[in-house]
Amino acid sequence: MGYSWPGNDRELATTLKRAVLISADGILRPQDIYFDLRRIEADGKINLLRSPSILKAVKSPLFPVIFQSAAAPFFFILLILLFLGPANPSSNVGALFSWAIGWPTMIFGAFIWARFWCSLCPMGAIGHLAKKLLSFNIPFPAFLKQKSDWIIAMSAMFIIWLEIATDLRSSPFNTGLLLLSIMLFAVFFSIVFERQSWCRYLCPLGGMMGVLAKVSPFELRADRNVCASQCSTNECFVGSSSCEGCPFGQMAPSLRSNRFCKLCGNCVKNCPHGAMNLNLRIPGREIWEMRQFGAITSFLVISMYGGLLSELLETGFLYDRFYHLFFDLPEIVVFTLFFTVAILSANALTLVAAMISSQISGETTKENFARYGLALLPLVMTGFMAYHLYYLINMGVYFPIVLWQTFHFSIFERLVITVPPSWTLFAQQTLVLIGSLGTIVISYRLSKGKHPVRISRRLIEVMPHILVALVLTGFLFYGIQSFFY
């Protein structure tokens, strides 16, 4: 009632139609209704779809099917190698690929191509194929949608804990069980619920990649000018005769985060008005352009840091002292306590900074924690990149050796390379420094958005969080040095 409706009855009808399409349980809520779509943030971005060759490739019916068709059979081969191959992970092709190539590809890929990995993911592709054979198409429960952030945060922390506490890297069989379990969940939820509900609301790996993808220099967004003035049929959501709608149930003009986009290109194929843009942007720009921040998402980001740090410190004197306090308990219990303490400590440190910063910003501590906690994302991402870079370099060297020994192709022998440890350490430290700088810049930009005039006040507001970022950077430096070298 407080909106002027410059588009008259057509804009009103379109707005209500969109609201009905995305509403849950047939109830319209304020968050289902959005207007004034014409405001877009296109400055400083390059639309790659202006290239005819790129546009043709994305609109092709082979995209991304051709990649999924290759990934799905490979996934089953990988499972066979994990279950039936050698128990020694250094001799098992499946285990080497999973940990030396698979995980690094996911982490680095979240930056390089955002959440496109979820379009390639064989588990999601197999679930989608199962859906075509049998589908009940039940609407995903609204209460699970509301708790999705918590479910993803807890399940992602469980995956990180499981990997460390059970030394999953040393057991190809257990690695296979984990991948098989995720695939079965994906198939079950694909058959029972509408669209790709598992990938959107529940998948722990997809949830982690979605959060990390916020830092990516790529984004798929709609030109909301076109949506508001020309579209009344919403093919991006409902689909067309040749292509289904958004698998994540997103309305293109309301999409503002890489977290909810797997870059499958369905909206590009379906939109008859050419409103979709594949933008090249400044990495991390999405964070300082956000209008709403969720404390749960920030908790997940900081907890990912805590989980990573707990593993890096596991071989150091801090863990030794902690272990001696509980030496009479089973080792897995002691590590679980250490894992929990690391997560809670990282969150507590950020919370204290938020309590101080909120006194300057004039917002609540929760709002401040949500905003600046997300600013730590570049540091967390590069921390994971630095961690997995070591395995990519030092475990990856065994991959061609094992291929050569297994398949007796001499070409694999020529692919063996070695990298001096000092080079690896330098690359890891450089990544962490870049992430720390990115966090500081984004933190400042977030304060700038809150106080656009008084520079001194912005600096005072952001300083506690900059200090936290520097402390967390120092722990990463120490952890990498002590764990790997």
Short names for language-model regions:
Residues 6, 126, 264:
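Short glycine-rich loop/turn motifs that provide flexible caps or phosphate-binding loops at active sites
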Residues 14, 264-269:
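P-loop NTPase catalytic cores that bind/hydrolyze ATP
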Residues 1-37:
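Nucleotide-binding/hydrolysis machinery
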Residues 35-257, 269, 273-485:
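Non-ligating segments of multi-cofactor redox enzymes
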Residues 259-263:
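Aromatic- and glycine-enriched pocket-lining scaffold segments that form the walls
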Residues 22, 206, 264:
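Short Cys/His-rich metal-coordination motifs, predominantly Zn2+-binding knuckles/fingers
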